C-alpha cells in the first residue's frame, strides 16, 4: 500500500477513536499494521481462513442436527 493511502486511513481512525472510546484498543493494532505495510509483508492467506470458517460452519451444523435429533418429540 502506498503512503498516500495509509495516512488518510490512519487519521480517519484517529478521528473515530477520538469520538468513540471503544476504538482506542484498535489503535495499537493499526500502528502495527502500518508498520507491516511499510515493511512490505504479504497479506495473510485469505483462502485458508475461508476454508477454516467453512469447516467450523459444517461442524456447527452437524452438532445442531445431532442435538435436534436427540430432543424428544412433543
From Swiss-Prot:
| Expression across tissues | Expressed by the venom gland.
Q: Does the keyword Hydrolase apply?
A: no
Record keywords, A-Z: Amidation, Antibiotic, Antimicrobial, Fungicide, Immunity, Innate immunity, Secreted, Signal
Q: Which biological processes are named by the entry's GO terms?
A: defense response to bacterium; defense response to fungus; innate immune response; killing of cells of another organism
Propeptide residues? Answer: 40-74
- Main localization (coarse): secreted
Which family does the entry's similarity section mention? Belongs to the non-disulfide-bridged peptide (NDBP) superfamily. Short antimicrobial peptide (group 4) family.
Q: What does this protein do?
A: Antimicrobial peptide. Is able to kill Mycobacterium abscessus subsp. massiliense in a dose-dependent manner. Has antifungal activity against Candida spp. and one Cryptococcus neoformans strains with MICs values ranging from 12.5 to 200 uM. Also shows an inhibitory activity on C.albicans biofilms at high concentrations. Shows low cytotoxic activity and has weak hemolytic activity on human erythrocytes. Shows anti-inflammatory activities, since it decreases release of pro-inflammatory cytokines, and increases release of anti-inflammatory cytokines.
Q: What is this protein called?
A: Antimicrobial peptide ToAp1
Amino acid at each position: 500500500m502506498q503512503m498516500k493511502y495509509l495516512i488518510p486511513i490512519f487519521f480517519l481512525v484517529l478521528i473515530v477513536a477520538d469520538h468513540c472510546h471503544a476504538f482506542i484498543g484498535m489503535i495499537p493494532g493499526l500502528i502495527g499494521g502500518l508498520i507491516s505495510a511499510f515493511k512490505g509483508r504479504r497479506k495473510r492467506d485469505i483462502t485458508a481462513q475461508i476454508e477454516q470458517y467453512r469447516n467450523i460452519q459444517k461442524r456447527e451444523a452437524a452438532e445442531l442436527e445431532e442435538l435436534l435429533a436427540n430432543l424428544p418429540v412433543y
